[in-house]
Amino acid sequence: MASPGSGFWSFGSEDGSADPENPGTARAWCQVAQKFTGGIGNKLCALLYGDSGKPAEGGGSVTSRAATGKVACTCDQKPCNCPKGDVNYAFLHATDLLPACDGERPTLAFLQDVMNILLQYVVKSFDRSTKVIDFHYPNELLQEYNWELADQPQNLEEILTHCQTTLKYAIKTGHPRYFNQLSTGLDMVGLAADWLTSTANTNMFTYEIAPVFVLLEYVTLKKMREIIGWPGGSGDGIFSPGGAISNMYAMLIARYKMFPEVKEKGMAAVPRLIAFTSEHSHFSLKKGAAALGIGTDSVILIKCDERGKMIPSDLERRILEVKQKGFVPFLVSATAGTTVYGAFDPLLAVADICKKYKIWMHVDAAWGGGLLMSRKHKWKLSGVERANSVTWNPHKMMGVPLQCSALLVREEGLMQSCNQMHASYLFQQDKHYDLSYDTGDKALQCGRHVDVFKLWLMWRAKGTTGFEAHIDKCLELAEYLYTIIKNREGYEMVFDGKPQHTNVCFWFVPPSLRTLEDNEERMSRLSKVAPVIKARMMEYGTTMVSYQPLGDKVNFFRMVISNPAATHQDIDFLIEEIERLGQDL
Protein backbone atom coordinates (compact mmCIF):
# COMPACT_ATOMS: atom_id res chain seq x y z
CA MET A 1 0.00 0.00 0.00
CA ALA A 2 1.31 3.46 -0.85
CA SER A 3 2.28 5.55 2.14
CA PRO A 4 -0.11 8.31 3.31
CA GLY A 5 0.30 11.50 1.35
CA SER A 6 2.07 9.90 -1.61
CA GLY A 7 -0.83 9.84 -4.05
CA PHE A 8 -1.64 12.50 -6.67
CA TRP A 9 -4.89 13.29 -4.87
CA SER A 10 -3.35 13.36 -1.38
CA PHE A 11 -3.72 16.34 0.93
CA GLY A 12 -2.00 17.65 4.04
CA SER A 13 1.14 16.57 5.84
CA GLU A 14 2.87 13.27 5.44
CA ASP A 15 2.80 12.54 9.18
CA GLY A 16 -0.92 12.00 8.82
CA SER A 17 -1.97 14.48 11.48
CA ALA A 18 -5.52 15.68 10.96
CA ASP A 19 -8.26 17.74 12.47
CA PRO A 20 -11.59 15.94 11.89
CA GLU A 21 -13.38 19.31 11.92
CA ASN A 22 -11.07 20.59 9.17
CA PRO A 23 -10.43 17.72 6.79
CA GLY A 24 -7.14 18.79 5.33
CA THR A 25 -5.43 15.40 5.11
CA ALA A 26 -5.93 12.19 3.21
CA ARG A 27 -6.92 10.43 6.39
CA ALA A 28 -9.58 12.94 7.34
CA TRP A 29 -11.02 13.01 3.82
CA CYS A 30 -11.04 9.22 3.81
CA GLN A 31 -13.00 9.20 7.05
CA VAL A 32 -15.59 11.44 5.44
CA ALA A 33 -15.66 9.27 2.32
CA GLN A 34 -16.41 6.15 4.36
CA LYS A 35 -19.92 7.52 4.96
CA PHE A 36 -20.76 6.85 1.31
CA THR A 37 -22.32 3.49 0.51
CA GLY A 38 -21.98 1.13 -2.41
CA GLY A 39 -18.20 0.99 -2.29
CA ILE A 40 -17.81 4.66 -3.31
CA GLY A 41 -16.02 5.46 -0.07
CA ASN A 42 -13.44 2.74 -0.66
CA LYS A 43 -12.76 4.00 -4.18
CA LEU A 44 -12.31 7.58 -2.96
CA CYS A 45 -9.90 6.38 -0.28
CA ALA A 46 -7.95 4.50 -2.92
CA LEU A 47 -7.52 7.74 -4.87
CA LEU A 48 -6.65 9.74 -1.76
CA TYR A 49 -4.02 7.27 -0.68
CA GLY A 50 -2.49 6.89 -4.10
CA ASP A 51 -3.80 3.39 -4.69
CA SER A 52 -6.07 4.23 -7.59
CA GLY A 53 -4.77 1.28 -9.55
CA LYS A 54 -5.90 -1.18 -6.89
CA PRO A 55 -9.51 -2.37 -7.21
CA ALA A 56 -11.69 -1.63 -4.21
CA GLU A 57 -13.34 -4.76 -2.89
CA GLY A 58 -16.97 -4.92 -1.84
CA GLY A 59 -18.40 -5.32 1.62
CA GLY A 60 -19.60 -3.10 4.39
CA SER A 61 -17.30 -0.67 6.08
CA VAL A 62 -16.19 -1.09 9.66
CA THR A 63 -15.79 2.00 11.79
CA SER A 64 -12.82 1.10 13.94
CA ARG A 65 -10.00 2.58 15.89
CA ALA A 66 -7.57 1.32 13.28
CA ALA A 67 -9.48 2.92 10.42
CA THR A 68 -8.85 6.30 12.04
CA GLY A 69 -5.13 5.74 11.77
CA LYS A 70 -4.37 4.73 15.37
CA VAL A 71 -2.69 1.38 15.62
CA ALA A 72 -2.13 -0.71 18.71
CA CYS A 73 0.63 0.44 21.02
CA THR A 74 3.70 -1.79 21.08
CA CYS A 75 5.62 -0.06 23.84
CA ASP A 76 5.25 0.41 27.58
CA GLN A 77 6.04 4.11 27.64
CA LYS A 78 3.49 6.77 28.52
CA PRO A 79 2.97 8.79 26.45
CA CYS A 80 3.35 6.20 23.71
CA ASN A 81 6.42 6.59 21.50
CA CYS A 82 5.32 4.05 18.89
CA PRO A 83 5.45 5.29 15.30
CA LYS A 84 2.00 6.11 13.98
CA GLY A 85 0.60 4.95 10.69
CA ASP A 86 -2.64 4.22 8.93
CA VAL A 87 -4.35 0.85 8.73
CA ASN A 88 -6.94 0.77 5.98
CA TYR A 89 -8.51 -2.67 6.05
CA ALA A 90 -9.98 -2.24 2.57
CA PHE A 91 -6.48 -2.85 1.17
CA LEU A 92 -5.34 -5.51 3.64
CA HIS A 93 -5.81 -9.26 3.54
CA ALA A 94 -5.03 -12.14 5.88
CA THR A 95 -1.69 -12.51 4.12
CA ASP A 96 -0.71 -9.07 5.46
CA LEU A 97 -1.03 -10.28 9.06
CA LEU A 98 1.58 -12.21 11.01
CA PRO A 99 3.64 -14.15 10.09
CA ALA A 100 3.95 -11.76 7.14
CA CYS A 101 6.97 -9.50 7.06
CA ASP A 102 6.02 -6.22 8.77
CA GLY A 103 2.76 -7.88 9.80
CA GLU A 104 2.93 -6.98 13.48
CA ARG A 105 1.33 -3.56 13.21
CA PRO A 106 -1.74 -4.56 11.12
CA THR A 107 -2.10 -7.72 13.21
CA LEU A 108 -2.29 -5.77 16.46
CA ALA A 109 -4.75 -3.31 14.94
CA PHE A 110 -6.92 -6.04 13.43
CA LEU A 111 -7.09 -8.12 16.60
CA GLN A 112 -7.82 -5.00 18.65
CA ASP A 113 -10.77 -4.24 16.41
CA VAL A 114 -12.01 -7.82 16.62
CA MET A 115 -11.76 -7.47 20.38
CA ASN A 116 -13.78 -4.26 20.25
CA ILE A 117 -16.52 -6.06 18.33
CA LEU A 118 -16.54 -8.86 20.90
CA LEU A 119 -16.60 -6.49 23.85
CA GLN A 120 -19.53 -4.57 22.39
CA TYR A 121 -21.37 -7.87 22.02
CA VAL A 122 -20.56 -8.85 25.61
CA VAL A 123 -21.94 -5.58 26.96
CA LYS A 124 -25.10 -5.90 24.85
CA SER A 125 -25.60 -9.45 26.11
CA PHE A 126 -26.28 -8.13 29.60
CA ASP A 127 -28.42 -5.20 28.47
CA ARG A 128 -32.06 -6.08 29.06
CA SER A 129 -33.15 -3.46 26.53
CA THR A 130 -31.50 -5.45 23.73
CA LYS A 131 -33.04 -8.44 22.02
CA VAL A 132 -32.16 -11.97 23.03
CA ILE A 133 -32.36 -12.81 19.34
CA ASP A 134 -32.77 -10.87 16.11
CA PHE A 135 -34.72 -13.66 14.48
CA HIS A 136 -34.83 -14.19 10.72
CA TYR A 137 -36.06 -17.25 8.88
CA PRO A 138 -33.35 -19.34 7.19
CA ASN A 139 -34.35 -18.29 3.67
CA GLU A 140 -34.28 -14.63 4.73
CA LEU A 141 -30.72 -14.87 6.03
CA LEU A 142 -29.62 -16.86 3.00
CA GLN A 143 -31.04 -14.23 0.66
CA GLU A 144 -29.94 -11.19 2.64
CA TYR A 145 -26.27 -12.14 2.85
CA ASN A 146 -23.85 -14.01 0.67
CA TRP A 147 -22.54 -16.79 2.90
CA GLU A 148 -20.89 -18.78 0.11
CA LEU A 149 -17.17 -19.52 0.13
CA ALA A 150 -15.16 -17.89 -2.65
CA ASP A 151 -11.91 -18.79 -4.38
CA GLN A 152 -10.45 -15.31 -3.98
CA PRO A 153 -9.68 -13.77 -0.57
CA GLN A 154 -11.72 -10.94 0.88
CA ASN A 155 -10.12 -7.92 2.50
CA LEU A 156 -9.98 -7.48 6.25
CA GLU A 157 -12.66 -4.80 6.21
CA GLU A 158 -15.06 -7.42 4.91
CA ILE A 159 -13.80 -9.94 7.44
CA LEU A 160 -14.60 -7.55 10.30
CA THR A 161 -18.03 -6.99 8.78
CA HIS A 162 -18.58 -10.76 8.77
CA CYS A 163 -17.71 -10.84 12.47
CA GLN A 164 -20.28 -8.14 13.20
CA THR A 165 -22.95 -9.76 11.04
CA THR A 166 -22.45 -13.16 12.63
CA LEU A 167 -22.85 -11.77 16.14
CA LYS A 168 -25.82 -9.65 15.09
CA TYR A 169 -27.84 -12.77 14.32
CA ALA A 170 -26.38 -15.00 17.03
CA ILE A 171 -28.39 -15.86 20.13
CA LYS A 172 -27.26 -13.88 23.17
CA THR A 173 -26.96 -16.89 25.45
CA GLY A 174 -25.59 -14.66 28.21
CA HIS A 175 -28.73 -12.48 28.19
CA PRO A 176 -30.50 -12.56 31.59
CA ARG A 177 -33.76 -13.45 29.82
CA TYR A 178 -32.47 -16.39 27.82
CA PHE A 179 -33.86 -19.56 29.42
CA ASN A 180 -34.02 -21.86 26.42
CA GLN A 181 -31.25 -24.36 27.12
CA LEU A 182 -29.44 -25.97 30.04
CA SER A 183 -26.27 -24.07 29.08
CA THR A 184 -26.77 -20.34 29.56
CA GLY A 185 -24.86 -17.36 30.88
CA LEU A 186 -21.56 -15.76 29.95
CA ASP A 187 -18.86 -15.83 32.60
CA MET A 188 -16.14 -13.22 32.07
CA VAL A 189 -13.30 -15.28 33.55
CA GLY A 190 -14.40 -18.33 31.58
CA LEU A 191 -14.53 -16.23 28.43
CA ALA A 192 -11.01 -14.92 29.04
CA ALA A 193 -9.81 -18.48 29.62
CA ASP A 194 -11.38 -19.61 26.36
CA TRP A 195 -9.56 -16.83 24.49
CA LEU A 196 -6.30 -17.91 26.11
CA THR A 197 -6.93 -21.54 25.21
CA SER A 198 -7.50 -20.67 21.56
CA THR A 199 -4.39 -18.50 21.52
CA ALA A 200 -2.26 -21.34 22.93
CA ASN A 201 -3.87 -23.64 20.31
CA THR A 202 -2.39 -26.88 21.54
CA ASN A 203 -3.58 -30.45 21.85
CA MET A 204 -4.11 -32.67 24.87
CA PHE A 205 -2.10 -35.61 23.49
CA THR A 206 0.87 -35.54 25.79
CA TYR A 207 2.65 -33.64 28.53
CA GLU A 208 5.35 -32.50 26.12
CA ILE A 209 2.93 -30.41 24.01
CA ALA A 210 0.48 -29.35 26.73
CA PRO A 211 2.43 -29.39 29.99
CA VAL A 212 0.36 -26.92 32.01
CA PHE A 213 -3.00 -28.01 30.60
CA VAL A 214 -2.32 -31.70 31.27
CA LEU A 215 -1.43 -30.91 34.89
CA LEU A 216 -4.54 -28.76 35.28
CA GLU A 217 -6.70 -31.58 33.93
CA TYR A 218 -5.13 -33.95 36.45
CA VAL A 219 -5.72 -31.53 39.35
CA THR A 220 -9.27 -30.62 38.31
CA LEU A 221 -10.48 -34.17 37.68
CA LYS A 222 -9.02 -35.27 41.02
CA LYS A 223 -10.93 -32.47 42.77
CA MET A 224 -14.15 -33.48 41.03
CA ARG A 225 -13.68 -37.09 42.13
CA GLU A 226 -13.13 -35.93 45.70
CA ILE A 227 -16.41 -33.99 45.55
CA ILE A 228 -18.19 -37.09 44.23
CA GLY A 229 -16.92 -38.89 47.32
CA TRP A 230 -14.30 -41.32 46.06
CA PRO A 231 -11.56 -41.67 48.72
CA GLY A 232 -8.70 -39.25 48.16
CA GLY A 233 -10.04 -38.41 44.72
CA SER A 234 -8.78 -41.74 43.42
CA GLY A 235 -9.79 -43.01 40.02
CA ASP A 236 -9.51 -41.68 36.50
CA GLY A 237 -11.28 -39.40 34.08
CA ILE A 238 -11.14 -37.27 30.99
CA PHE A 239 -12.75 -34.20 29.48
CA SER A 240 -14.83 -35.07 26.44
CA PRO A 241 -16.71 -33.12 23.72
CA GLY A 242 -19.99 -33.31 25.66
CA GLY A 243 -22.26 -35.33 27.91
CA ALA A 244 -23.32 -37.66 25.10
CA ILE A 245 -19.70 -38.69 24.49
CA SER A 246 -19.04 -38.99 28.24
CA ASN A 247 -22.01 -41.36 28.52
CA MET A 248 -20.71 -43.38 25.58
CA TYR A 249 -17.30 -43.59 27.27
CA ALA A 250 -19.04 -45.07 30.33
CA MET A 251 -20.82 -47.66 28.20
CA LEU A 252 -17.56 -48.52 26.41
CA ILE A 253 -15.62 -48.95 29.65
CA ALA A 254 -18.40 -50.96 31.34
CA ARG A 255 -18.44 -53.36 28.40
CA TYR A 256 -14.66 -53.70 28.48
CA LYS A 257 -14.67 -54.32 32.23
CA MET A 258 -17.02 -57.28 31.82
CA PHE A 259 -15.63 -58.60 28.52
CA PRO A 260 -12.11 -57.28 27.80
CA GLU A 261 -11.86 -59.52 24.73
CA VAL A 262 -14.41 -57.32 22.94
CA LYS A 263 -11.66 -54.79 22.27
CA GLU A 264 -9.91 -57.11 19.80
CA LYS A 265 -12.66 -59.51 18.74
CA GLY A 266 -15.72 -57.31 18.67
CA MET A 267 -19.32 -57.99 19.61
CA ALA A 268 -19.29 -61.42 17.95
CA ALA A 269 -17.14 -62.66 20.82
CA VAL A 270 -19.59 -61.74 23.58
CA PRO A 271 -23.20 -62.60 24.45
CA ARG A 272 -25.98 -60.09 23.92
CA LEU A 273 -25.43 -57.20 26.32
CA ILE A 274 -28.26 -55.17 27.85
CA ALA A 275 -28.15 -51.66 29.33
CA PHE A 276 -30.85 -50.09 31.49
CA THR A 277 -31.84 -46.48 31.92
CA SER A 278 -34.99 -44.56 32.81
CA GLU A 279 -37.64 -43.57 30.29
CA HIS A 280 -36.82 -39.94 31.15
CA SER A 281 -33.09 -40.33 30.57
CA HIS A 282 -31.09 -38.61 27.86
CA PHE A 283 -31.27 -40.03 24.34
CA SER A 284 -27.46 -40.28 24.25
CA LEU A 285 -27.61 -43.70 25.92
CA LYS A 286 -29.33 -45.14 22.86
CA LYS A 287 -27.00 -43.24 20.54
CA GLY A 288 -24.02 -44.70 22.37
CA ALA A 289 -25.44 -48.21 22.08
CA ALA A 290 -25.91 -47.69 18.34
CA ALA A 291 -22.37 -46.37 17.89
CA LEU A 292 -20.79 -49.21 19.89
CA GLY A 293 -22.64 -51.94 18.02
CA ILE A 294 -24.71 -52.90 21.05
CA GLY A 295 -27.92 -51.74 19.37
CA THR A 296 -30.73 -49.50 20.51
CA ASP A 297 -32.98 -52.51 21.15
CA SER A 298 -30.51 -53.53 23.84
CA VAL A 299 -31.23 -50.40 25.88
CA ILE A 300 -34.23 -51.07 28.11
CA LEU A 301 -36.15 -48.09 29.44
CA ILE A 302 -37.27 -48.35 33.06
CA LYS A 303 -40.55 -46.85 34.21
CA CYS A 304 -40.57 -43.59 36.16
CA ASP A 305 -42.91 -42.20 38.80
CA GLU A 306 -44.98 -39.05 38.27
CA ARG A 307 -41.96 -36.87 39.11
CA GLY A 308 -39.77 -38.55 36.49
CA LYS A 309 -37.66 -40.69 38.86
CA MET A 310 -36.66 -44.23 37.98
CA ILE A 311 -38.70 -46.88 39.85
CA PRO A 312 -36.17 -49.33 41.41
CA SER A 313 -38.62 -52.23 41.57
CA ASP A 314 -39.18 -52.01 37.82
CA LEU A 315 -35.42 -51.93 37.26
CA GLU A 316 -34.94 -55.14 39.22
CA ARG A 317 -37.88 -56.80 37.47
CA ARG A 318 -36.44 -56.01 34.03
CA ILE A 319 -32.97 -57.22 35.04
CA LEU A 320 -34.41 -60.58 36.08
CA GLU A 321 -36.36 -60.83 32.81
CA VAL A 322 -33.20 -60.24 30.80
CA LYS A 323 -31.19 -62.80 32.74
CA GLN A 324 -33.91 -65.41 32.26
CA LYS A 325 -33.57 -64.91 28.49
CA GLY A 326 -29.85 -65.62 28.70
CA PHE A 327 -28.80 -62.03 28.01
CA VAL A 328 -26.18 -60.21 30.09
CA PRO A 329 -27.01 -56.98 31.97
CA PHE A 330 -23.82 -54.90 31.88
CA LEU A 331 -24.80 -51.29 32.63
CA VAL A 332 -27.38 -49.33 34.57
CA SER A 333 -27.37 -45.60 33.85
CA ALA A 334 -29.15 -43.58 36.52
CA THR A 335 -29.83 -39.90 35.93
CA ALA A 336 -29.09 -37.07 38.35
CA GLY A 337 -31.07 -34.23 36.85
CA THR A 338 -33.20 -35.31 33.89
CA THR A 339 -33.34 -32.98 30.91
CA VAL A 340 -37.05 -32.14 31.08
CA TYR A 341 -38.29 -32.65 34.65
CA GLY A 342 -34.94 -32.16 36.39
CA ALA A 343 -35.55 -35.40 38.32
CA PHE A 344 -32.96 -37.26 40.38
CA ASP A 345 -33.14 -41.04 40.28
CA PRO A 346 -32.90 -42.80 43.70
CA LEU A 347 -29.17 -43.50 43.47
CA LEU A 348 -28.85 -45.45 46.72
CA ALA A 349 -31.56 -47.93 45.70
CA VAL A 350 -30.08 -48.24 42.22
CA ALA A 351 -26.63 -48.83 43.72
CA ASP A 352 -27.99 -51.66 45.87
CA ILE A 353 -29.47 -53.37 42.81
CA CYS A 354 -26.27 -52.95 40.79
CA LYS A 355 -24.23 -54.43 43.62
CA LYS A 356 -26.64 -57.34 43.98
CA TYR A 357 -26.43 -58.29 40.30
CA LYS A 358 -22.82 -57.20 39.71
CA ILE A 359 -23.70 -54.56 37.12
CA TRP A 360 -21.72 -51.41 36.31
CA MET A 361 -23.48 -48.34 37.74
CA HIS A 362 -23.17 -45.14 35.78
CA VAL A 363 -24.65 -41.81 36.87
CA ASP A 364 -25.47 -39.29 34.17
CA ALA A 365 -25.10 -36.09 36.22
CA ALA A 366 -24.48 -33.91 33.18
CA TRP A 367 -27.20 -31.51 34.35
CA GLY A 368 -27.36 -32.22 38.07
CA GLY A 369 -23.67 -32.69 38.88
CA GLY A 370 -23.25 -29.01 39.70
CA LEU A 371 -25.46 -29.47 42.78
CA LEU A 372 -22.57 -31.37 44.37
CA MET A 373 -20.98 -27.93 44.86
CA SER A 374 -23.87 -26.85 47.11
CA ARG A 375 -24.08 -27.92 50.74
CA LYS A 376 -27.80 -27.15 50.59
CA HIS A 377 -28.63 -29.30 47.56
CA LYS A 378 -25.97 -32.03 47.22
CA TRP A 379 -28.14 -34.50 49.18
CA LYS A 380 -30.13 -34.95 45.97
CA LEU A 381 -27.19 -36.97 44.63
CA SER A 382 -26.82 -39.20 47.70
CA GLY A 383 -25.36 -42.48 46.49
CA VAL A 384 -23.36 -41.02 43.62
CA GLU A 385 -20.20 -42.06 45.47
CA ARG A 386 -21.18 -45.71 44.86
CA ALA A 387 -21.19 -45.29 41.09
CA ASN A 388 -18.51 -46.82 38.88
CA SER A 389 -18.59 -43.79 36.59
CA VAL A 390 -20.13 -40.33 36.52
CA THR A 391 -20.81 -37.82 33.73
CA TRP A 392 -20.61 -34.21 34.92
CA ASN A 393 -20.98 -31.18 32.62
CA PRO A 394 -19.63 -27.95 34.16
CA HIS A 395 -20.80 -26.14 31.00
CA LYS A 396 -24.37 -26.55 32.21
CA MET A 397 -25.24 -25.74 35.81
CA MET A 398 -21.83 -24.27 36.65
CA GLY A 399 -21.87 -21.78 33.77
CA VAL A 400 -18.51 -22.73 32.23
CA PRO A 401 -18.35 -21.77 28.53
CA LEU A 402 -19.05 -24.61 26.11
CA GLN A 403 -17.72 -27.19 25.88
CA CYS A 404 -16.72 -28.67 29.24
CA SER A 405 -17.85 -32.21 30.06
CA ALA A 406 -16.06 -34.72 32.27
CA LEU A 407 -16.31 -38.49 32.55
CA LEU A 408 -15.10 -39.65 35.96
CA VAL A 409 -14.22 -43.33 36.55
CA ARG A 410 -13.74 -44.89 39.97
CA GLU A 411 -11.22 -47.56 38.89
CA GLU A 412 -7.83 -46.16 37.97
CA GLY A 413 -6.20 -47.50 34.81
CA LEU A 414 -9.35 -49.05 33.36
CA MET A 415 -9.92 -46.28 30.84
CA GLN A 416 -6.31 -46.52 29.69
CA SER A 417 -6.39 -50.26 29.10
CA CYS A 418 -9.77 -50.01 27.38
CA ASN A 419 -8.76 -47.39 24.82
CA GLN A 420 -4.98 -47.37 24.41
CA MET A 421 -3.51 -48.21 21.01
CA HIS A 422 0.19 -47.48 21.73
CA ALA A 423 0.75 -45.13 18.78
CA SER A 424 4.54 -44.98 18.78
CA TYR A 425 4.77 -41.62 17.04
CA LEU A 426 3.01 -39.98 20.01
CA PHE A 427 3.41 -42.19 23.05
CA GLN A 428 7.06 -43.19 23.02
CA GLN A 429 7.99 -45.26 26.06
CA ASP A 430 11.51 -43.86 26.51
CA LYS A 431 10.66 -40.20 27.18
CA HIS A 432 12.53 -38.33 29.89
CA TYR A 433 9.47 -37.56 32.08
CA ASP A 434 6.69 -39.45 33.90
CA LEU A 435 4.65 -41.09 31.14
CA SER A 436 1.51 -41.22 33.27
CA TYR A 437 0.97 -37.60 32.22
CA ASP A 438 0.67 -38.61 28.57
CA THR A 439 -3.10 -38.94 28.79
CA GLY A 440 -4.00 -38.97 25.11
CA ASP A 441 -4.01 -42.74 24.66
CA LYS A 442 -6.93 -43.24 27.04
CA ALA A 443 -9.14 -41.00 24.90
CA LEU A 444 -11.18 -42.14 21.91
CA GLN A 445 -10.10 -39.01 20.08
CA CYS A 446 -6.63 -38.37 18.81
CA GLY A 447 -6.82 -34.59 18.64
CA ARG A 448 -8.45 -33.29 21.82
CA HIS A 449 -9.40 -29.71 22.63
CA VAL A 450 -8.23 -28.07 25.86
CA ASP A 451 -11.49 -27.89 27.82
CA VAL A 452 -10.11 -27.78 31.34
CA PHE A 453 -8.55 -24.32 31.53
CA LYS A 454 -11.79 -22.32 31.62
CA LEU A 455 -13.15 -24.50 34.44
CA TRP A 456 -9.88 -24.33 36.37
CA LEU A 457 -9.55 -20.54 36.00
CA MET A 458 -13.19 -19.96 36.97
CA TRP A 459 -12.72 -22.20 40.00
CA ARG A 460 -9.69 -20.16 41.05
CA ALA A 461 -11.65 -16.94 40.54
CA LYS A 462 -14.88 -18.02 42.26
CA GLY A 463 -13.75 -20.71 44.64
CA THR A 464 -16.04 -23.60 45.50
CA THR A 465 -18.10 -21.14 47.54
CA GLY A 466 -18.65 -19.00 44.45
CA PHE A 467 -20.04 -21.94 42.50
CA GLU A 468 -22.18 -22.80 45.51
CA ALA A 469 -23.66 -19.28 45.59
CA HIS A 470 -24.30 -19.44 41.83
CA ILE A 471 -26.15 -22.76 42.10
CA ASP A 472 -28.12 -21.81 45.21
CA LYS A 473 -29.27 -18.61 43.51
CA CYS A 474 -30.49 -20.43 40.40
CA LEU A 475 -32.46 -22.96 42.44
CA GLU A 476 -33.95 -20.15 44.52
CA LEU A 477 -35.11 -18.42 41.32
CA ALA A 478 -36.75 -21.66 40.16
CA GLU A 479 -38.60 -21.94 43.45
CA TYR A 480 -39.65 -18.29 43.12
CA LEU A 481 -41.16 -19.01 39.69
CA TYR A 482 -42.92 -22.13 40.96
CA THR A 483 -44.35 -20.25 43.95
CA ILE A 484 -45.78 -17.52 41.72
CA ILE A 485 -47.43 -19.65 39.04
CA LYS A 486 -48.66 -22.67 41.01
CA ASN A 487 -51.80 -20.80 42.11
CA ARG A 488 -51.88 -18.13 39.40
CA GLU A 489 -54.83 -18.02 37.03
CA GLY A 490 -53.97 -19.36 33.61
CA TYR A 491 -51.20 -21.74 34.72
CA GLU A 492 -51.20 -25.47 35.34
CA MET A 493 -48.24 -27.44 36.66
CA VAL A 494 -47.14 -30.54 34.76
CA PHE A 495 -46.45 -32.36 38.04
CA ASP A 496 -47.23 -31.60 41.67
CA GLY A 497 -44.68 -30.40 44.18
CA LYS A 498 -41.61 -28.21 44.20
CA PRO A 499 -39.06 -28.86 41.48
CA GLN A 500 -35.88 -30.65 42.57
CA HIS A 501 -33.75 -28.77 40.09
CA THR A 502 -34.26 -25.49 38.24
CA ASN A 503 -36.63 -27.17 35.77
CA VAL A 504 -40.14 -25.74 36.17
CA CYS A 505 -42.66 -27.40 33.84
CA PHE A 506 -46.05 -25.80 33.23
CA TRP A 507 -48.83 -25.04 30.78
CA PHE A 508 -50.11 -21.57 30.08
CA VAL A 509 -53.86 -21.80 29.49
CA PRO A 510 -55.21 -18.79 27.56
CA PRO A 511 -58.62 -17.36 28.55
CA SER A 512 -60.40 -19.10 25.66
CA LEU A 513 -59.53 -22.54 27.07
CA ARG A 514 -60.02 -21.96 30.79
CA THR A 515 -63.72 -22.85 30.84
CA LEU A 516 -63.43 -25.95 28.66
CA GLU A 517 -63.77 -29.43 30.13
CA ASP A 518 -60.58 -31.43 30.47
CA ASN A 519 -61.03 -33.60 27.40
CA GLU A 520 -59.27 -34.54 24.18
CA GLU A 521 -60.37 -31.39 22.35
CA ARG A 522 -58.99 -29.16 25.11
CA MET A 523 -55.67 -31.03 25.10
CA SER A 524 -55.47 -30.76 21.33
CA ARG A 525 -55.98 -27.00 21.46
CA LEU A 526 -53.66 -26.61 24.46
CA SER A 527 -50.88 -28.41 22.58
CA LYS A 528 -50.78 -25.54 20.08
CA VAL A 529 -50.40 -22.77 22.68
CA ALA A 530 -46.75 -23.15 23.68
CA PRO A 531 -45.41 -23.34 20.08
CA VAL A 532 -47.24 -20.15 19.10
CA ILE A 533 -46.07 -18.23 22.18
CA LYS A 534 -42.50 -19.44 21.59
CA ALA A 535 -42.64 -18.30 17.96
CA ARG A 536 -43.89 -14.88 19.05
CA MET A 537 -41.13 -14.66 21.66
CA MET A 538 -38.56 -15.20 18.95
CA GLU A 539 -40.19 -12.73 16.57
CA TYR A 540 -40.13 -10.02 19.25
CA GLY A 541 -36.76 -11.19 20.57
CA THR A 542 -37.72 -10.44 24.17
CA THR A 543 -37.04 -13.79 25.84
CA MET A 544 -36.70 -17.49 25.06
CA VAL A 545 -37.93 -20.57 26.91
CA SER A 546 -38.21 -24.13 25.66
CA TYR A 547 -41.27 -26.33 25.24
CA GLN A 548 -41.91 -29.98 24.42
CA PRO A 549 -44.41 -32.82 24.82
CA LEU A 550 -43.53 -35.79 27.03
CA GLY A 551 -45.36 -39.10 27.05
CA ASP A 552 -49.09 -38.42 27.19
CA LYS A 553 -48.56 -34.78 28.13
CA VAL A 554 -49.06 -32.25 25.33
CA ASN A 555 -46.65 -29.38 24.69
CA PHE A 556 -45.69 -27.55 27.87
CA PHE A 557 -43.08 -24.96 28.80
CA ARG A 558 -39.88 -26.19 30.42
CA MET A 559 -38.22 -23.34 32.23
CA VAL A 560 -34.59 -23.87 33.27
CA ILE A 561 -32.29 -21.44 35.04
CA SER A 562 -28.50 -21.69 35.02
CA ASN A 563 -27.57 -18.06 34.35
CA PRO A 564 -26.55 -16.19 37.54
CA ALA A 565 -27.33 -12.89 35.79
CA ALA A 566 -31.06 -13.65 35.99
CA THR A 567 -33.08 -11.97 38.77
CA HIS A 568 -36.58 -12.04 40.24
CA GLN A 569 -37.45 -9.20 37.87
CA ASP A 570 -36.49 -11.36 34.89
CA ILE A 571 -38.75 -14.14 36.15
CA ASP A 572 -41.57 -11.61 36.54
CA PHE A 573 -40.92 -10.38 33.00
CA LEU A 574 -41.12 -13.92 31.62
CA ILE A 575 -44.52 -14.50 33.23
CA GLU A 576 -45.87 -11.18 31.96
CA GLU A 577 -44.51 -11.82 28.47
CA ILE A 578 -46.09 -15.27 28.25
CA GLU A 579 -49.42 -13.76 29.26
CA ARG A 580 -49.07 -10.85 26.82
CA LEU A 581 -48.19 -13.09 23.89
CA GLY A 582 -50.76 -15.77 24.66
CA GLN A 583 -53.76 -13.77 25.78
CA ASP A 584 -55.52 -13.88 22.40
CA LEU A 585 -54.99 -17.57 21.64
From Swiss-Prot:
Transmembrane ranges?
none
Q: Which cofactor does it need?
A: pyridoxal 5'-phosphate
Q: Which reaction does it catalyse?
A: L-glutamate + H(+) = 4-aminobutanoate + CO2
In its record, the post-translational modification comment is: Phosphorylated; which does not affect kinetic parameters or subcellular location.
Q: What does this protein do?
A: Catalyzes the production of GABA.
Question: How is this protein situated with respect to the membrane?
Answer: Lipid-anchor; Peripheral membrane protein
The taxonomy runs:
Eukaryota, Metazoa, Chordata, Craniata, Vertebrata
A cellular component annotation (GO) from this entry: clathrin-sculpted gamma-aminobutyric acid transport vesicle membrane
From which organism does this entry originate?
A: Mus musculus
Q: Does the keyword Lipoprotein apply?
A: yes
Oligomeric and partner information: Homodimer.
| Similarity annotation | Belongs to the group II decarboxylase family.
Top enzyme class? lyase
Q: What is this protein called?
A: Glutamate decarboxylase 2
Q: Which residues carry this modification: Phosphoserine?
A: S3, S6, S10, S13
